[in-house]
């Protein structure tokens, strides 16, 4: 079933795939990594000026990684927000997605956390570095194929 935003994107010739609706009735769309930045700018101009959250997850061991964006558009009033969920899937061998930091500044720490935990590289992010794990940490802890070390010694600050 095609939602309102999906119909609008089709009308304007923007490539995407409708994934239906979630349990709250929020439309979910899949965007290719190479199209994501331009579609993000278009969505911002169209009125989706609030990035509610960004997260990422490992779809399956050895499979794809996903970066998920929850966007909100408030046109008629605060009590009637229009929401959409965007999913961008990337291969785990070279997980690269254009950063939308320059579109929604609030994605800064969220993209950094996705990088730190899953190793998704957000191209053109101004400060893409580990945010939760020490810089010396090896691997991506939230990947399903991650093997946790038996021991990790945290160095003292002095």
UniProtKB/Swiss-Prot annotation:
**Alphabetized InterPro entries for the sequence:** NADH_DH_suC (IPR010218), NADH_quin_OxRdtase_su_C/D-like (IPR037232), NADH_UbQ_OxRdtase_30kDa_su (IPR001268), NADH_UbQ_OxRdtase_CS (IPR020396)
Q: Give the enzyme's EC designation.
A: 7.1.1.-
* Pfam families from the UniProt entry: Complex1_30kDa (PF00329)
Gene3D superfamilies attached here?
Answer: NADH:ubiquinone oxidoreductase, 30kDa subunit (3.30.460.80)
- Location relative to the cell: Plastid, Chloroplast thylakoid membrane
| Keywords, comma-separated and alphabetical | Chloroplast, Membrane, NAD, NADP, Plastid, Plastoquinone, Quinone, Thylakoid, Translocase, Transport
Q: Where does it primarily localize? A: plastid
Task: Kindly state one GO CC term assigned in the UniProt record.
Answer: chloroplast thylakoid membrane
Catalytic activity reads: a plastoquinone + NADH + (n+1) H(+)(in) = a plastoquinol + NAD(+) + n H(+)(out); a plastoquinone + NADPH + (n+1) H(+)(in) = a plastoquinol + NADP(+) + n H(+)(out)
**A GO molecular-function descriptor:** NADH dehydrogenase (ubiquinone) activity
Topology within the bilayer = Peripheral membrane protein
HAMAP family, per the entry? NDH1_NuoC
The record describes its quaternary structure and partners as: NDH is composed of at least 16 different subunits, 5 of which are encoded in the nucleus.
Q: What job does this protein perform?
A: NDH shuttles electrons from NAD(P)H:plastoquinone, via FMN and iron-sulfur (Fe-S) centers, to quinones in the photosynthetic chain and possibly in a chloroplast respiratory chain. The immediate electron acceptor for the enzyme in this species is believed to be plastoquinone. Couples the redox reaction to proton translocation, and thus conserves the redox energy in a proton gradient.
Q: Which family does it belong to?
A: Belongs to the complex I 30 kDa subunit family.
Name recorded for this polypeptide: NAD(P)H-quinone oxidoreductase subunit J, chloroplastic
| Organism, as annotated | Fagopyrum esculentum subsp. ancestrale
Underlying gene: ndhJ
